[in-house]
Amino acid sequence: MATPSSIPAEPKRDVVNRIHRVTRGNRSLWYQMTVLQQPERARACGSGSKANSDRRPVDPPPVVELRIIEGPSVEEGKDITFDYNANFFLYASLEHARPLARGRVNTPAAGNPPILTGVPASGMAYLDRPTEAGYFIFPDLSVRHEGLYILTFSLFETTKEERDFDLEPADGDLPPGVDYRMEIKTDPFSVYSAKKFPGLMESTQLSKTVADQGCQVRIRRDVRMRKRESKPGAGNSNSGGNGFERREEDFGRRRTITPASEDPHSIRNRSHSNSSEQRTPYTDASRRPSMVDSYPPPPPPPSYEPAPSASRHLDFGDSSAAQYPTPRQYAHQPGLQITPGPPSGSYAPTAQSPYSKTDAPYGYVNRNIPPSCPSPAPSVKHDLYDRRQSTSSYVPPSPSVYSTEGHHRRDSRPSYPPTPVAAPRPRPMHSQTSLPALKIDQLVSPVSPLPPIEPQTGPAPELPPINVGGKRKHESVFAQSTRPLHNGQRQVDPHYGRSHRGYSPDHDQGWYSRADGQISSVQFNRYYDE
């Protein structure tokens, strides 16, 4: 039976534990176990329904090394770990680092709570690095409750050859061929709650070396530690010391802040509503974003175009008349012919009104028009303003029949139906009458400016009712009786009022039903055979 040579009461980091046993074949074997990687911290996973899905393994994962030496002593013996024909497995158990005080009520659940979860057993892996030996790795160990704990590893051997059995029979509780060999304990480590857990550290070099050789070990390339401000008077002797502070500083340097937008003048995305559009104070009429501003623009102010002559003999008054800007010029509508007016020097000026009163042709009713000039047509476009030639460089031709006829055609507009208007239109002129010349000093005078232009509105003409087609009602076509029917009576149909529909006693007369439901008769022609 194996007897432990020395079991220290308080094992330290990288503590070596050895035992010696003699087999039935008189072989002297030495078992040496070393904890190469001690656990430092863990996060409590609790015991609720989410305990299994939200587990945090012990960090770093514990790693235990096993060597088997054959010889009179360890120093003089030979390492036969790879040549020894047996199976080994290591079982981990969790214990409190300090004994707990017993309470008044002792229950089995309180005495032995299930505080260790995960995979507590590990088989031996034969690795070449860091040295040729057998290694036990525990990458999936979790603790349910916070506190200070230690791990105890128990080594069990399954002997395959009879010469390697013990001299004395082993414990009867174990199956035949399975023997308990030795145990070793780790250093105390802390288990934190979810709020106090400082985070996981970067994987150690030993974990990376073991993982490179095919063992299932989780490797973390970055630091996952939570940076917390140290409170005065709050110290933990088992916090890890300098390694903790160094990793927290590295983690603090790597943390970054979400960068702000590079363009501070960028405009946010447009809303789907029409009222939230970003408009400038003066927008172009041709670029309206929606139906909010789709009303037609107001009519432009009237333009007074002087009729220049080649001799330039008209007097424009004193120098103060220069303060009036040149009126805006508008292009004529498509389809309308515009001809220049007669020269201003051929007619005598009038003082009452710039327009002479004439009879309206083609049945137009005479209407009293005030001296104010009518407004031009509002349907103009900005892109046509500059296409019209300047009146200062235009020489009008002499008045003729063609010019007056074209002017009459422009004003009469017989091809358009009458529509209600908001502003008065120019009076139509007869082909045989002409307008007197306009005097500029009467239109533009610094002493008596023109009165404001006001639109004249009149009652809209009543349009005749439009006959809208539709289906006739059933009552207007088919006569129905509302009296009750008894004893098998049926509704009287006027189409079947006679005994034989379409026939009459008179052979020269026939009856038929019209589309509106009325019964009509027709006379047939009489043909006699001679």
Swiss-Prot record:
Domain Velvet: start-end pairs: 26-220
Tree of life domain: Eukaryota
Protein purpose: Component of the velvet transcription factor complex that controls sexual/asexual developmental ratio in response to light, promoting sexual development in the darkness while stimulating asexual sporulation under illumination. The velvet complex hat acts as a global regulator for secondary metabolite gene expression. Controls positively the expression of the gibberellins, fumonisins and fusarin C gene clusters. Controls the expression of the fusaric acid gene cluster. Controls negatively the expression of the bikaverin gene cluster. Regulates the expression of laeA.
Regions of compositional bias (Polar residues) in chain numbering: 347-356, 478-490
Basic and acidic residues bias spans: 244-253, 380-389
Keywords tagged on the record: Cytoplasm, Nucleus, Sporulation, Transcription, Transcription regulation
Location in or out of the cell: Nucleus; Cytoplasm
Residue segments, region Disordered: 206-516
UniProt keyword Cytoplasm, yes or no: yes
Family, similarity comment: Belongs to the velvet family. VeA subfamily.
One GO BP: sporulation resulting in formation of a cellular spore
Compositionally biased intervals (Pro residues): 295-305, 415-426
Gene3D superfamilies: Velvet domain
Motif (Nuclear localization signal): 40-45
Name the record gives this protein: Developmental and secondary metabolism regulator VEL1
GO cellular component, one term: cytoplasm
Inducing or repressing factors: Expression is repressed in media containing high amounts of nitrogen.
Domain remarks in the Swiss-Prot or TrEMBL record: The C-terminal PEST domain is a region rich in proline, glutamic acid, serine and threonine residues that is required for the light-dependent regulation of development and secondary metabolism.
Stretch list, region PEST: 429-460
Regions of compositional bias (Low complexity) in chain numbering: 390-404
Disruption-associated phenotype: Impairs the production of gibberellins, fumonisins and fusarin C. Reduces both the fusaric acid gene cluster expression and production of fusaric acid. Affects conidiation associated with stunted aerial hyphae.
Species, as recorded: Gibberella fujikuroi (strain CBS 195.34 / IMI 58289 / NRRL A-6831)
Record's subunit section: Component of the heterotrimeric velvet complex composed of LAE1, VEL1 and VEL2; VEL1 acting as a bridging protein between LAE1 and VEL2. Interacts with LAE1.
